[in-house]
Amino acid sequence: QRLAHDKDLVESRSIIVKAKAIISRYSNATDEHFAKMRAELEHADLSEKAKRDVLRGFDKSSGQSKIIAIQLWAYETQIVEVMDQIITELTNKRKQWYVRDDRIVFGNASLHQLISKKMERVQQLGEQEEELRRSAVKRANENLDKVN
């Protein structure tokens, strides 16, 4: 539906540029985020023993958590890159497609095939990202159960 109002793909390109900037800003802040969390724990209003235990648990799990965060940002980066490729293809071959009833209609089978494959890749990356999120939540819940 958005494409029906963005036939020259200017808005789509703008969304891609903004998404890349957001991903870059937040993915580059991953280390800082974990350091900030640790600093907050160090200054938490807890007994020294409780604080040591909390910090030990944080230090034990933060390495894996940071790896997962980096992997999630990598999925986001890949998804946006593939979407960028799609927008570029559609822009470069503007005369080979049109929008009808809020759907792209291709006048060229090879372009349709290429865009479909790229959309399948976006779907696949999204599913892999979601699976990583689910497994991370499951692992976190299991670790919380061990503490309780």
State what each model feature region is.
Residues 93-148:
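A cross-kingdom marker for long, charged
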